[in-house]
């Protein structure tokens, strides 16, 4: 697969296969912080994630909306282990118009259907005011394989 052939759905499939990813944000004191996250859904041609407006991660992404994400799942044949890494810009959609509000509600509902943890945390209520969704834009990165890493 060449770079020009990689689609948002290829990235989503890779993230689903990995399961848990690690996202780096810039903390308010300008230091990086890495935490586990999980990609949730593709809607409107975008990768969507979620967070809680009371968490530090939300404040960090509001102040500096640039992140890097990395994920991998070690295979039995370690040399065949694939991993994904990319940087992107975070967008919390403004819900000022009816169309965007409907999209955000659709995304939140899909996330709650996918994730038992999110369903439980927000009591299956897409209107919970602390439940925030965001998508990534300007994604740049790569799919890699441990067998092709050079220079280590």
Predicted regions span which residues?
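Short glycine/serine/proline-enriched coil/turn segments at secondary-structure junctions
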Residues: 29-31, 77-80
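A short, Trp-centered hydrophobic/proline-enriched beta-strand micro-motif
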Residues: 13-29, 67-71
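Charged, amphipathic alpha-helical segments
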Residues: 4-9, 54-57, 114-120
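Charged, gly/pro-rich active-site loop segments
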Residues: 2, 82-152
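A short mixed-secondary-structure module that forms the rim of ligand-binding clefts
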Residues: 40-78
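Short, surface-exposed charged micro-motifs
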Residues: 38-39, 133
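N-terminal leader/targeting segments and the immediate start of mature chains
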Residues: 1-19
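A generic structural signal for short beta-strands and their flanking turns/coil linkers
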Residues: 19, 35, 43-45, 63-67, ...
